[in-house]
Amino acid sequence: MAHHEPIGLIAPNTGLAQLNERSRDIFRQIVESYLATGEPVGSRNISRLISMPLSPASVRNVMADLEQLGLIYAPHTSAGRLPTELGLRFFVDALMQVGDLTEPERQSIQAQLSSVGRAQTVEAALGEALTRLSGLTRAAAVVLTAKSNVRLKHLEFVRLEPERALVILVAEDGQVENRVLALPPGVPSSALTEASNFLNARIRGRTLAEARLELETMLSQDRTELDQLTQKVISAGIASWSGGDGEDRQLIVRGHANLLEDLHAMEDLERVRRLFDDLETKRGVVDLLGRAESAEGVRIFIGSENKLFSLSGSSTIIAPYSDGAGHIVGVLGVIGPTRLNYARVIPMVDYTARIVSQMLGG
């Protein structure tokens, strides 16, 4: 099972790490009750659920301590308690037992994805993977992938105006992409030719990401014999492909409707409405998913741990997937309420990412 990285909210020397078995048992019951029902739970119910014999009064004392630690809180409408986002993070990192998928679940995911992978495009296979994942987890499933991981063949600069040029990028499979590029003042045609020759000697057979990384490294270390204007043309060309606005990334979402299930209040509906809006506009989602591309294994963001878009009240569980060369080429996962069934969803995301990686590896 791939690891999941804590976000660093819980230091080992805090009171949380010192919780005794009784406190952990009571806290676990509060969280598990919340994950199952979404409702606050009171001391009387907890005293019936825990393994050790404790009166409701004793349970209330422990709950007061847990509240002081910031692990649980009392919603204003109820005498019961709910876990805070910090509490959920502590539960996921320290108390939860992550189970394995059953063999039928593994076979089902593998069979469906392998049949699609043989017959259709990578995008279609990823869409199928998400449909499967959203159905199994009852959450929205998302994938962030490069629009194309094809290998590059040729690049050309065509001057449009004194300070604008068209960059024509041709891939080995025949795809052509054009970008308009702002040129530094005073760039002669010879600099465009020199930049084209320099780039074409280095990009052929590479993906866009690989070419970009090598060129940025060469320019930053000044390992070229190029004059300053030509270097500026190359830097501008690299920036035009960098897709900082997410243009070179494709975001696919499946299972929006799952987020509308089991809403408990108007604020739940408002949270989901904002989430729909963010998924529609890609606001922050590309940045969030991109954070998983630099780490192996499953990443978990609970509620406001993610500051990139309005995920307060929601959780994101994501994992990267790789191509045949072992390079990370995308991220997939689920977005749902904070009361996701973490122990079940984490292995599903992990396994789906592994199967997609195998599929892309051929």
Curated annotation (Swiss-Prot):
One of its GO terms (molecular function) is DNA binding. It holds the Pfam family HrcA. Keywords: Repressor, Stress response, Transcription, Transcription regulation. The keyword Transmembrane helix does not apply. The gene is hrcA. Belongs to the HrcA family. The keyword Hydrolase does not apply. This is Heat-inducible transcription repressor HrcA. It comes from Rhodopseudomonas palustris (strain HaA2). Negative regulator of class I heat shock genes (grpE-dnaK-dnaJ and groELS operons). Prevents heat-shock induction of these operons. InterPro entries: GAF-like_dom_sf, HrcA, HrcA_C, WH-like_DNA-bd_sf, WH_DNA-bd_sf, WHTH_transcript_rep_HrcA_IDD. GO terms for biological process: negative regulation of DNA-templated transcription.
